[in-house]
Amino acid sequence: MKIEVNNELISRLQNLALVELNDREKERIKRDIKNILDFFDQINKLDLSNVEPLFHPISTGKLRKDEIIKPLSRDEALSNVKRKEDGFIVGPATYGE
């Protein structure tokens, strides 16, 4: 499936990223995204059926056995928390609040 990189896509990405872009920046990002997608298209066209994997992202030799353990109580979980309120952990404010 070919992704069409157009102004609508750039506007959607801009809104998702919560950034403001000028026209020059939008054109540069549009060009960069097209180049990245073209590069992935080239990679996808490679025949790798006879190539053995050289790396596995998850090492199967270092996994521990699943064991049921006693969970922390609320008091234990909150014992080392710097900021708490009404029995809940208070985290940092997020964007827009």
Swiss-Prot record:
Gene Ontology molecular-function annotations: asparaginyl-tRNA synthase (glutamine-hydrolyzing) activity; ATP binding; glutaminyl-tRNA synthase (glutamine-hydrolyzing) activity
Keywords: ATP-binding, Ligase, Nucleotide-binding, Protein biosynthesis
GO BP terms in the entry: glutaminyl-tRNAGln biosynthesis via transamidation; regulation of translational fidelity; translation
Catalytic activity: L-glutamyl-tRNA(Gln) + L-glutamine + ATP + H2O = L-glutaminyl-tRNA(Gln) + L-glutamate + ADP + phosphate + H(+); L-aspartyl-tRNA(Asn) + L-glutamine + ATP + H2O = L-asparaginyl-tRNA(Asn) + L-glutamate + ADP + phosphate + 2 H(+)
Domain of life assignment: Archaea
Family designation: Belongs to the GatC family.
Function: Allows the formation of correctly charged Asn-tRNA(Asn) or Gln-tRNA(Gln) through the transamidation of misacylated Asp-tRNA(Asn) or Glu-tRNA(Gln) in organisms which lack either or both of asparaginyl-tRNA or glutaminyl-tRNA synthetases. The reaction takes place in the presence of glutamine and ATP through an activated phospho-Asp-tRNA(Asn) or phospho-Glu-tRNA(Gln).
Assembly and oligomerization: Heterotrimer of A, B and C subunits.
Listed name of the protein: Glutamyl-tRNA(Gln) amidotransferase subunit C
Gene: gatC
